[in-house]
Amino acid sequence: MSDNPPATDAQPPVPYQVYKPELEQVPSAIATLLAEYAGIPPEAQKEHIKTVRDQAFKSYPYPCLGRWRFLELDLSRHPLYHSYIVPMMSNDEKAADGAAAGGGKDDWIFLDLGCCLGQDIRKLIFDGGDASRIYGADLRPEFIDVGYALFRDEDKFPRAEHFIAPADVFDFSPESELSKKCDGRVGILHSTSVFHLFDWDQQVAMACRCLQLMTTKNGRVLICGCQVGNVTAGEFPRRLGGGSRYRHNEASWKKMWDEVVRQESSKYEIRAVRAGAEMYGRDQDRVREELAAQRLAQGEDQETASEAKEGGSKEELRYIGRFEEGMRWMKYWVWIDFA
C-alpha cells in the first residue's frame, strides 16, 4: 500500500466540452497514415473521419471519440519509439545492440494493452513493424469495431488473430483470452492512459499482471506508455463515486516498480529493473480529456453521457471534468532484465 499522503484537489470545476462537432484539421501524422496505410485520399479524410466518429459516438459517447482524441498517436511520440521500438519490431535484422528477450525476434510479441481504436498499432505497422507479432487488447470490443471502420484493414490485419477484447487487466486467470494469447510472450508492452485510472494498490496489481504477460527468457523487456501524472505524487479523490486514483511523478513511479519486483520475487528471477519518466508541461485540454474518460468509464457521468448520446448538435454543449493542480502529462518506461 502507498504511504504517500492523499493529495488535495481544491480546484473548482472547469467547463469541459465532451463533444466537438467539427474537426478543424486532420493532424498530419494520422493524415499520412490514412492516405498511405488505409488508402483514403486527403480530400476524403475529414468526411470519412467525421462519419466514422459520429456513428460511433451515437452508441459509445466516450470523450476520446467526441473530442477527436483518437486521432493522436501517442506511441510514436514516446522517446523510445524511434530509437528502440521501431527497430526492434521491424522486419530487418535485429538491432546491432541486441534484441529483446529471447535473443530472436520470432520469440516474442508486441502488445498494446488498452489499445483503444488500435491507432498506435496501425502507425507501428506503417513504420515498418512486423504485423504478425503485433497485438492489441482493450476492455471494450466496440473500440476495435470503430478502428476497423476507420482504417479499413480487416482483410490484412484480421481481428481474430490480433485483437483481444474484452480484456480485463485484473484477470490473472490462465483461461482468459489475454492469458492464452499473450502470457509469457510479450517483449514490448505499450499501455497509455490505463495505469492512471486506478489507485496505488490497483496499479500495483496491474503491474503484476503486466509481468505475467512478459517473456522471461534471458534478455531485456520493455513496458512503456503515457499517463496523467502530477508533480506532487499521491492519491487524488474522485469527484464522484468515492475512491481515489494515484497520480505519479518519476520518483513514485520508480518506487512502485521496486515494490512490484519485491512482491513478485518468488515468481520471477529479476536481475534488474529500471523505471523512468519524463513530465511534460501542463496541457489542460489533454488532461481534462483523460479525467472525463475516467469518469465516464467508471460510471460517474452517466447523465452527461446520456445527453451526449442523444444530442450532438453544434448548439448543445455538454461539460464534465475538473482540472487537478500540479497535473502533467507523463511519458514512462520500465526496463526489466530477467535472469
Predicted regions and their residues:
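Class I (Rossmann-like) S-adenosyl-L-methionine-dependent methyltransferase catalytic domain
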Residues: 2-178, 203, 209, 217-339
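A short SAM/SAH-binding and catalytic strip from SAM-dependent methyltransferases
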Residues: 184-202
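Helix-to-beta-strand junctions that scaffold the AdoMet/dcAdoMet cofactor pocket
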Residues: 198-199, 214-218
